[in-house]
Amino acid sequence: NGVWAAVPALKAAGLDPTKPATTIDAWIADMEKVKAAGLTPITMGMAWTQLELLETILIADLGVDAYNGLFDGKTDWGGAEVTKALGHYKTCVGFSDSSLYTEDWEPAMKPIMDGKAAFNVMGDWAVAGFDAAGKKAGQDYVYFPVPGTDGVFDFLADSFTLPDGAKHPGGAKNWLNTISSKDGQIAFNTVKGSIPARTDLTDEEKGKFSEYQRSAMESFAKDKIVSSIAHGAALPAKATNAMNDALTKFAQGASDVTALQADLKAAAAS
């Protein structure tokens, strides 16, 4: 649930990169200022990136308990609190560049890297993209929790499995042992931009990671953890795919908030 923001765009809009908004409404007000400065307020790509933005707005507007309730029936997808979140989502979509809706996350993040757009909501792998582009945290970009989600960690995990009947189980087991070792976790995650599943790294070993990754490790250790919808941690794939379809329809102007909410409720029940 991280926002990646372009320092040049924020400064052009008269915003202080070190003082991000703390509520969705305040964030939208900042987007208004970015738009007035002639820049794109927020970017998003294809449906799964749109769902990632939506889920973080749901976390912000509903809170942890009500957000988790969306997955066990305690929170109604058709309820007023979800309607409010979808209204905020609609506003954000209206601030975005629709030409990017068929692109993956990298092209949608490029305007942030180029300083031509202000905000993008994306997972921690974005830091690897900024590093590859030679961009510096604090100088070229800043990162902060989606406003209203401070103290929450929106979770997903990379997983490697040993399939039943694999032709080379020995090699697969060697890979699993390697990737789960300290050295394997450090080598994999420092390049990908993610954080280790292991929690036994020393301070010296943590020092091999970027500033962002170290902050994410601290967040994961102390914050309330919720499951990501967009990345399959909260709902079955069938439901997630149906939500992606609903957001694609909404982005294309083929549905309104009322229809989107009905589609999401039906998807969650599928």
Can you name each region flagged by the protein language model?
Residues 1, 26-74, 117:
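Extracytoplasmic/periplasmic solute-binding protein
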Residues 1-10, 40-41, 142-143, 147-152, ...:
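A structural signal for short loop-to-beta-strand junctions that line the ligand-binding cleft
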Residues 9-10, 28-37, 106-120, 245, ...:
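Short helices/loops that flank or line small-molecule/ion binding pockets
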Residues 20-22, 62-84, 132-136, 141-153, ...:
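Short, solvent-exposed loop/beta-turn-alpha elements that line the ligand-binding surface or hinge
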Residues 29-32, 72-101:
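Glycine-centered hinge/linker elements that transmit conformational signals in sensory
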Residues 35, 39, 177-200:
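Periplasmic-binding protein-like
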Residues 87-168, 174:
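Extracytoplasmic/periplasmic substrate-binding proteins
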Residues 199, 214-267:
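C-terminal capping/gating helix-and-loop segments adjacent to ligand/active sites or protein-protein/ligand interfaces
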